[in-house]
Design a protein with these regions (language model features):
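Catalytic glycan-binding domains that act on GlcNAc-containing polysaccharides
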Residues: 1-109
Length: 109
């Protein structure tokens, strides 16, 4: 999700007001933000990932599965082609392959 949403940039802000690694829109998730988070709590990577993971977990539960939950999280619930979920899952696979190659090279050394 982070790779697709922000390209791993913790200071990313969208024109829609989404902030941080997981591109959380503060006005929709005020109740999930810490009271002592300062003016821009979602630009803190730890806070952003905690809130984003909670939002994603709720979305998966509410929508009945990973693909549907990802679609809702990405604001694309009505996309019949499930392009957002496909992008996220492709990014996950790419990262898993890169990690496996890295481990393989490390064990060869």
């Amino acid at each position: 999700v982070i790779g697709v949403e922000s390209g791993f940039n913790p200071l990313s802000e969208s024109v829609m007001g989404a902030q941080g690694l997981m591109q959380i829109i503060p006005r929709f998730h005020q109740e999930k933000l810490p009271d002592d988070g300062g003016d821009l709590p979602l630009l803190d990577p730890i806070t952003n990932v905690h809130v984003g993971a909670r939002v994603l977990k709720e979305s998966i539960r509410r929508n009945g599965g990973l693909t549907e939950g990802l679609q809702q999280f990405g604001g694309a619930a009505n996309d019949p082609d499930r392009r957002y979920a496909s992008r996220v899952l492709a990014e996950k696979q790419r990262l898993e392959q890169a990690a496996a190659q890295s481990r393989s090279r490390a064990s060869d050394s």
